[in-house]
Each structure stands twice: as C-alpha cells, then as structure tokens.
C-alpha cells in the first residue's frame, strides 16, 4: 500500500512537472453543446442554456438555476401546456410585428424567429462573465420573408461569490434594407419569463413585487416599473425559496415601462403596450434587459440595488471587431 502511494505521488509530481505552463480553468464559460444548445456554466455547473435550434419556433433559455439544481422556470403553462406551448421558460418575442404573430405557436399569420448564425467570435469566457452572440431572422411562416434582423447577446455574470447572478440580454432589431417594420401596440412582448409552478402565486403561494412596492397581479398588472420580481418556494427545505427579478434598462423606449405580470406564474416587460414602434435598416432598435436570479425572497431594497448595479454596467458592443 505504501509502495503504491509512493508511485502515485511520483506520477502526480511528474505530470505537474510536464505542464508548467498550464493555465487556470476559466470560471464562467459559454460552452457549445450538441443539438443547437449553448450551456452557460459556472465552475462546471450549468446555470442556464440557450436553445437556438432553427427548427424551433424561437430561441429560448432553459433551465434557469439559482444555487439549487431545480429550475426556477418551466416550459408551458402548468394548466394548459399545449395552448401555452409558446411559454418557453425565458424568451424574446412579440405578437404584433407588421401583421404577423411571433408570440403564439399556431396563429393564422404565424411568425418564426430563426437562428441563422452563432459566430465563433461571439463566444467570450472570463472569470467574471461569459457571453455568446447570435443573429436571428424574424420571418413569415407563409412566405419566409424576413421582417426583422436581430442581433442578440447573452451574458451571464455571477454576483457575490456566485450566490446569485445576472443574465443580461442585449438586442438590436432592424428591418431589411429599404423596408419599415412596425411593432404594434400590445402587452405581449418583448421579453417574458414563465416561472416554475411552485413559484406562481396561484399554484405555489409565491409573491410578485415591483419597484414601486406594488404586490401581486391586482396591483402590478401592466403598471410601469423599473423592475419586477417573482419569488417563491422551489424546495421543502426551510430556506427553499428563490426568484427572478426582471429588469428594464433606462435606455429602452418608454422607460419605466409596463410589466405584464400574472398570478398564474408569468411576467413580461412590455415594449410597446400603448405606442407602436417602427424600425428600418437605419433606424434600429437597441434594447437591454436583465434577469437577476437569486436565492430567497428578494426585498424591494435588494432588487433595487441590483437594478442600480445593472444600469451602471457598461453597455455591450453588439458589433465588435474581429480579433
């Protein structure tokens, strides 16, 4: 036994000596995976993943984990998974783009958001954050015509020693050359979150809170705010609570914007609730959102402090020069 341990220690020392220039493993990584998935990992543990299969109706992020392995989000409405199949955990979409519906999955005039590029230069890994950049086309299902050319960047940034983290979503939306595209007045779009069943107010006894101190759907529904938090139970442990604060950025149109939030477990940040927005190939729409994923039931002061922190971060460059 002693002899075996001696040879093992010699082997380890030898291996270490053979790699004197070995570099530390980057803590936060965006890892390309099979089947059009990019996994965002902290110290090898997946926090979330971007699903960008061109055959899907739209790209989306799932799962979304705090410090436990249980996802804080789900696919579909817990009581109507087929009718709400478009509730894809965390997703970007809109139900009135020209005359097309990109919100639902079975509309009369159906739109689809198709990923067309994830460039190698779009992946960045550091000890502080990881990101990936992609290009999506918003197309008509009927004739495949392009309505919107979207550049999207997802950044994962751990906070407080990884006890919580930001998912920052940067978007640029433009029409094809020579065209004008209109985002109609609606409460459905642009970024939305379907919470886990146990977090919902109706199903799990969770809680909604916005930046104005308003609580749950009767007070929060379609009210302007800087952010909105949805927190609830995800395990039966005494401290088994977690949540997500969805944050709007001051650079976005109509800030502070309305939040479309329901006690049944979903929340969205409205882009054009009452006022349509037009984009062209020159007049592009630049947007920035964040999700603060956290353990526990967030207080108003905690979510507000995180919102301030989010707004003070440098705005990402969506068109960096190739290295």
Give residue spans per PLM region.
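Bacterial N-terminal signal peptides
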Residues: 3-14
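Extracellular/lumen-exposed scaffold segments
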Residues: 55-106, 205-227
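Acidic (Asp/Glu-rich), glycine- and aromatic
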Residues: 43, 50-56, 60-65, 160-207
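Beta-strand-rich N-terminal accessory domains
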Residues: 19-86, 161, 304
């Amino acid at each position: 036994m002693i002899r075996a341990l001696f040879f093992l220690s010699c082997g380890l020392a030898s291996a270490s000596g053979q790699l004197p220039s070995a570099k530390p493993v980057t803590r936060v990584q965006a890892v390309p995976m099979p089947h059009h998935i990019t996994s965002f990992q902290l110290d090898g543990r997946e926090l979330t993943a971007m699903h960008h299969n061109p055959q899907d109706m739209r790209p989306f992020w799932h799962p979304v984990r705090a410090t436990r392995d249980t996802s804080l989000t789900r696919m579909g409405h817990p009581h109507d998974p087929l009718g709400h199949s478009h509730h894809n955990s965390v997703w970007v979409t809109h139900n009135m783009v020209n005359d097309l519906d990109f919100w639902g999955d079975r509309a009369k005039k159906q739109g689809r958001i198709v990923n067309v590029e994830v460039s190698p230069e779009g992946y960045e890994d550091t000890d502080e954050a990881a990101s990936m950049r992609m290009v999506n086309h918003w197309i008509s299902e009927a004739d495949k015509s392009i309505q919107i050319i979207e550049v999207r960047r997802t950044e994962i940034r751990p906070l407080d020693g990884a006890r919580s983290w930001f998912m920052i979503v940067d978007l640029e939306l433009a029409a094809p050359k020579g065209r004008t595209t209109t985002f109609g007045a609606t409460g459905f779009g642009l970024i939305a979150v379907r919470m886990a069943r146990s977090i919902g107010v109706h199903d799990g006894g969770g809680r909604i809170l916005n930046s104005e101190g308003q609580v749950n759907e009767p007070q929060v529904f379609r009210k302007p705010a800087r952010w909105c938090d949805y927190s609830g139970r995800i395990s039966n442990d005494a401290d088994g609570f977690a949540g997500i604060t969805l944050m709007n950025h001051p650079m976005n149109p109509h800030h502070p914007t309305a939040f479309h939030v329901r006690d049944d477990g979903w929340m969205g940040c409205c882009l054009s609730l009452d006022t349509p927005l037009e984009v062209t190939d020159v007049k592009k729409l630049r947007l920035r959102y964040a999700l603060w994923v956290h353990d526990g039931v967030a207080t108003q002061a905690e979510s507000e402090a995180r919102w301030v922190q989010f707004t003070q971060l440098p705005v990402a460059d969506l068109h960096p020069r190739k290295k």
